[in-house]
């Protein structure tokens, strides 16, 4: 989610998991110890397996206290390149942001219309939404000042405090696209944060070659990019053909940047054939070896992530 920049993903918040294994045995992997180097890290293996190695029946989670001071900032840019290039600068500025979200102008426009909200530059603005947390007011002021300076250096048109309206637009952006097309797909690409500007610019430019309608938003602070691609009035045949043509360009490019197919949604069924195609053969073979050893009958969540 959008706070992974500061707090990490769900896997970083799990102490241990209780699991029903394919052989029917019940085991607990992990512990509440602050550190443990006793054997394999099986809890993380289970967490990352999408249910293909066992069924999680219980999880012990960490609780992290909220910081007493925080501010949400909306930085508006009139150029995609400026908004995207600001992201790695914000992440590396030493302000430890809680979230850095990006919305392209198409999403800003559609979500504002859907929510019936009038936000700055809703017709021509690219949004970076940044949350900063601190333990005292002086620290918050210092971080905010640094953030404002970075945004101004990156040619932000407006930098204002974000209110609930901004987050309402962000939360409803995916739902808002249903007014344009009931059929679409969402990519879940992830690249190093230092490469996110190049990735967004390149793939948005590539998408102009096709008849589908592209939208882009990102959990930009951790390099996770969602391309929402809408079918609109395309024929079924053209839709399938052009979608595959786009992916044939996008996926190798993402991997060339050190990225991967999925940052948070997982492989499941949707990305299964691409997992086979783009994953390093040695890595893929290792996964299949683990699966075969733990679940020789392939009964756990069959047909997902990897195939026999």
Feature map (PLM): residue ranges:
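FAD-binding subdomain of flavoenzyme oxidoreductases
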Residues: 1-101
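A short, flexible low-complexity segment enriched in Lys/Arg and Gly/Pro that occurs
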Residues: 15-35, 197-201, 234-245, 275-278
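Activity-critical C-terminal alpha-helical subdomain
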Residues: 25, 272-308
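Short, hydrophobic/aliphatic alpha-helical segments
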Residues: 26-47, 205-208, 244-258, 288
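Conserved, mostly hydrophobic/aromatic
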Residues: 51, 227, 295
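C-terminal substrate-recognition/cap domain of FAD-linked oxidoreductases
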Residues: 65, 76-249, 253, 257
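Small/polar glycine-rich anion-binding or flexible loop at a beta-alpha turn
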Residues: 106, 220-223, 261, 266-273
């Amino acid at each position: 989610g959008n706070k992974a920049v500061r707090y990490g993903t769900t896997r970083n918040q799990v102490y241990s998991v209780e699991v029903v294994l394919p052989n029917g045995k019940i085991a607990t992997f992990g512990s509440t110890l602050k550190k443990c180097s006793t054997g394999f890290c099986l809890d993380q293996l289970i967490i990352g397996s999408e249910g293909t190695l066992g069924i999680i029946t219980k999880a012990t989670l960490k609780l992290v206290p909220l910081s007493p001071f925080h501010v949400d900032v909306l930085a508006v840019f009139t150029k995609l390149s400026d908004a995207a290039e600001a992201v790695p600068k914000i992440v590396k500025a030493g302000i430890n942001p809680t979230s850095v979200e990006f919305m392209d102008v198409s999403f800003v426009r559609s979500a504002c219309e859907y929510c019936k909200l009038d936000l700055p530059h809703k017709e021509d603005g690219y949004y970076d939404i940044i949350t900063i947390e601190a333990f005292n007011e002086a620290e918050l002021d210092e971080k905010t000042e640094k953030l404002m300076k970075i945004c101004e250096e990156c040619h932000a048109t407006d930098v204002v405090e974000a209110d609930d309206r901004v987050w309402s637009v962000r939360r409803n952006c995916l739902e808002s696209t249903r007014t344009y097309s009931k059929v679409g797909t969402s990519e879940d690409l992830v690249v190093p944060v230092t490469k996110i500007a190049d990735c967004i610019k390149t793939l948005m430019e590539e998408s102009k070659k096709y008849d589908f309608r592209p939208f882009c938003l990102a959990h930009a602070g951790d390099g996770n990019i969602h391309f929402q691609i809408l079918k609109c009035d395309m024929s079924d045949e053209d839709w399938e053909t052009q979608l595959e043509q786009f992916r044939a360009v996008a996926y190798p490019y993402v991997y060339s940047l050190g990225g991967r197919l999925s940052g948070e949604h997982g492989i499941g069924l949707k990305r299964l054939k691409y997992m086979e195609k783009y994953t390093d053969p040695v890595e893929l073979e290792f996964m299949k070896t683990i699966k075969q050893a733990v679940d020789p009958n392939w009964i756990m969540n069959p047909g997902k992530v990897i195939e026999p």
